[in-house]
Regions:
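N-terminal FAD cofactor-binding segment of flavoenzymes
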Residues: 38-89
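Glycine-rich FAD pyrophosphate-binding loop
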Residues: 20-44
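Short, well-ordered alpha-helices that flank and scaffold nucleotide-derived cofactor binding pockets
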Residues: 17, 21-25, 113, 186, ...
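Long, low-complexity C-terminal extensions of enzymes
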Residues: 278-377
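Beta1/beta-strand and adjacent pyrophosphate-binding region of the FAD-binding site
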Residues: 1-11
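Predominantly flavin-linked oxidoreductase catalytic cores and closely associated redox partners
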Residues: 114-216, 220
Length: 377
């Protein structure tokens, strides 16, 4: 069996590494990654949930001492200025697990040299490759006719380099602003991603670039490095003919809140791995589309409580409707359970061991309480 991954961005690298690692002892499986070295990976420093560092540790010998990707600790996400009840809300990850921030250029080099798959430098059409299974990870599409929009109030970002040491924080920062919110990714000054580790996210149909730049510079000590516009979207057909699978930005793009992308890439390749090697799933497309729509909904929920700013953006952001009975059911559950019982059963809690997209009940409980109950710190 031959499996080919096309593209070596975040999605392509994690796809090839997962497949190469989990099939390494199967002599009947060959994994190959083909990419154009002239096509640069994402420039912005990345943040993850816990699966990415777990895979990198297992398959590349990455660790916090031997750290060639300038990774920094991510113990959770600190929300500043969100809602009307608390100045700060901390979305804590389980204390026995650690997510990360990393430089995508250096991660690409680490993965391509892992030895778990063959690497070929070339420009190819995935649909013309002779292989049993193909993963199309060529990045954002030029034509969106086979895609649908994801609901989100953000469509632009100004990237910047910080003039302070961001690595003192062991968490991502999500700071509410009059025009949206700003991410601050703890990044070493020697990392290639340091120039792009602060991002002011906004809606270009509401705020002008000039006003946004002024607000950005007034709120943060940064040097602006790049302007980015984007769409939030998902492929209508993530799996084509049970042979070609879209992943990475070829599959979807959703604004960076909650760092959902890399976890989703790994979840999707895991679904497909199980489909190929263990049991056939006739509903692959429906499954991943539902998963990504859940990511969309959880992110939208963060805007519904507003922020300390009463502006046009925040009025607009609160208008998005979440149309999912499962979402409403879980929200009702977390309103009637203590934060301790919301812990997973494995940790001594009594909550159901479920996930909505990527989030267990304790994540839901953290946000619900932070938006509705004054936290004593």
């Amino acid at each position: 069996m031959k499996i080919v991954v096309v593209g070596a961005g975040n999605g392509g690298c994690f796809t090839a590494l997962y497949l190469g690692w989990h099939t390494r002892n199967n002599p009947d499986v060959e994994v190959e990654l083909i990419y154009n070295p002239e096509s640069s990976p994402e420039i912005v420093g990345q943040a993850t949930l816990v699966d990415a560092p777990s895979l990198l540790w297992a398959a590349t010998d990455f660790n916090w001492y031997n750290n060639p990707i300038h990774a920094t600790f991510k113990s959770g996400i600190l929300y500043e200025g969100w809602g009307k009840v608390n100045d700060k809300v901390y979305h804590s990850f389980p204390a026995d697990k650690m997510a990360m921030h990393y430089c995508p250029w250096e991660m690409q080099n680490l993965v391509l040299n892992s030895g778990h798959f063959k690497v070929i430098e070339d420009e190819v059409d995935p649909y013309e490759i002779d292989a049993d299974y193909i993963f199309d990870c060529r990045g954002k599409p030029d034509d969106f006719s086979d895609y649908e929009d994801l609901k989100n109030p953000i469509n632009a970002c100004i990237l910047a380099e910080p003039n302070w040491d961001t690595t003192k924080a062991l968490w991502s920062r999500h700071v509410a602003t009059p025009d949206g919110w700003t991410f601050v990714i703890p990044t070493h000054s020697s990392s290639p991603s340091h120039k792009y580790c602060v991002g002011y996210c906004y809606n270009s149909n509401i705020s002008t670039k000039g006003d946004v730049e002024n607000n950005f510079l007034n709120m943060f000590d940064v040097n602006i490095t790049k302007h980015v516009d984007f769409k939030n979207y998902i492929a209508k057909n993530p799996a084509v003919d049970d042979r070609v699978f879209k992943n990475g930005n070829r599959l979807f793009f959703l604004e960076p809140m909650e760092s959902s992308s890399n976890q989703a890439y790994i979840a999707w390749v895991r679904f497909i791995y199980m489909h190929i090697f263990h049991f056939k799933n006739p509903n692959l497309n429906d499954g991943i589309i539902e998963y990504i729509k859940q990511l969309q909904n959880f992110v939208l929920w963060h805007y519904q409580y507003g922020s300390k700013y009463d502006t046009l953006f925040w009025d607009y952001a609160k208008t998005f409707i979440i149309d999912d009975p499962r979402f409403d059911e879980i929200k009702d559950m977390v309103s009637n359970v203590s934060k301790y019982d919301a812990r997973p059963a494995l940790s001594g809690g009594i909550s159901k061991d479920f996930f909505y997209g990527q989030w267990a009940m304790f994540s839901w409980k953290c946000w619900y309480d932070g938006m509705t109950t004054k936290v004593i710190t």
